[in-house]
Amino acid sequence: RPWQMQSELSLMPLAVSVPIAMDAQHKFFRLKIPSSCISDPHIQFMSANSLNDRDVVVAISQSGNTAALVESIKTVKSFGVIVIGLMPSNTPLSRICDISLDIDVGENARLTRPLTSRLAYMAIIDVLAVGVAQLKPEAQDHLFNIVTSQNSLKLK
């Protein structure tokens, strides 16, 4: 149960997967889970060296074949960190993740692929966030407090 032993959540995307990871960071932050989105491969590698076996990394890749991300995740795993991967099945990244959430959108058109893939990935992130919120009642209270406190920021 990675969400129960987690002390920090690091999201590691590259390129077109970055907005998806930023959305995930926002969702988990609102659930009172310390999270960061690290989209630079060099910083991913350096961050990997500061993680421990209580941390969780979510690797996000729409190809699953990016060498820099695969190398960062190999380093992360060498420190005993649990890695959850969101990527297509049967890719180098899917083969090294502890938990693979394979997302195969089955499309070839370059014009529609980014949109369809992004929607599929964001739906999975939403499901994960709801699942975590259900496991952590205190997260639900925190989310309610955040939403309520934002009312003062709105124009009347």
Question: What label would you give each PLM region?
Answer:
Residues 138-156:
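A short, charged, Gly/Pro-tolerant segment at domain boundaries
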Residues 2-123, 127-136:
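Glycine-rich phosphate-binding loops that contact phosphosugars or nucleotide phosphates
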